[in-house]
Amino acid sequence: MNSLVALVLLGQIIGSTLSSQVRGDLECDDKEAKNWADDAVRYINEHKLHGHKQALNVIKNICVVPWNGDLVAVFLELNLLETECHVLDPTPVEKCTVRQQHNHAVEMDCDAKIMFNVETFKRDVFVKCHSTPDSVENVRRNCSKCPILLPPNNPHVVDSVEYVLNKHNEKLSGHIYEVLEISRGQHKYEPEAYYLEFVIVEINCTAQEAHDDHHQCHPYTAGEDHIAFCRSTVFRSHASLEKPKDEKFESNCVILDVKDGHAHSHLIQQHIEKNSISPEHNITILNFVHPDDHTSTSHESHEHVAEVPVVFVKKELPTDISDHHTTPVKGCPGKVHHFKLY
């Protein structure tokens, strides 16, 4: 009898958990809505190939629609903010600092659709995002001398990164690095300087070979990779036309051993032999479909990312993602977790 009661109670618990996941009357600040939004943000950060991780800022809208059979479609409109963690950084996004307005913040608006199977708990995620930096006018309105964001391919930014890299390679005996990606550059004032964020990777060359245009240098194979996240400031004038030679600079690079199977180890291969300049803002940066084969509803474990390399399929998003017009929902948009850019 006790076993039967326990079985009934277990069924009620499972049923309650399942029904909470597929509620159709969600408001944007409901816990269930936050769980769906966290799912979408997690996938964005796990599969974003360039730049920095994103943090949830506002759930702008949510709509849960019954689909075919056991499928439920969850449509989300999200506003995210750029953090200071690069996408290759293993730090959980919850522990990443959101880039503040005085440091020229960048926001990202995303349309997401999660197809959820209530029987198998499988999720198919479709995401389309567009990032936009805060306007220069807004930054200067509150802080006239705050650093201004520059395109990562700005000549001063590129030259300054190469200058710092050469200085590092001179000091690191037996270890030579090359730029994997320039993810941020800013023009600073008083004193005038260039602030840089970039990622470097160790290569299988000597210093002499690295300067030989005829010698092919490559990053080490998976499991032997050493990458470093660098934040540097090079003090030089915007009017300088020559490449930096003896300018003062400050730099801090955190070196990370990349383990084979690390959640983002496959992304390093995406960077190798590619353009080392991060894509500029104001463009759609994500357009992917990724199936999730979880067999439970847990939001904690995502080891499958490390076990199986993700295959990206270039395809048009279903029209019902960006063209799905969700009617305004009571309680939406939700609260602002950080700040709004205007």
UniProtKB/Swiss-Prot annotation:
Classification via CDD domains: CY
Cystine residue pairs: C28-C332, C85-C96, C110-C129, C143-C146, C205-C217, C230-C253
SMART domains listed in its UniProt record: CY
Record motif Cell attachment site, residues: 23-25
UniProt keyword list: Disulfide bond, Glycoprotein, Metalloenzyme inhibitor, Metalloprotease inhibitor, Protease inhibitor, Repeat, Secreted, Signal
Gene Ontology cellular-component annotations: blood microparticle; extracellular matrix
Broad class of the protein's primary localization: secreted
Tissue: Expressed by the liver.
Note: Is highly stable to extreme pH and heating, stability that may be conferred by the disulfide bond between Cys-28 and Cys-332.
Function: Inhibits hemorrhagic and proteolytic activities of metalloproteinases (HR1A, HR1B, HR2a, HR2b and H2 proteinase from T.flavodidis and brevilysins H3, H4, H6 and L4 from A.halys brevicaudus). Has no effect on brevilysins H2. Has no effect on papain and cathepsin-B.
Protein's name according to its UniProt entry: Antihemorrhagic factor HSF
Organism annotation: Protobothrops flavoviridis
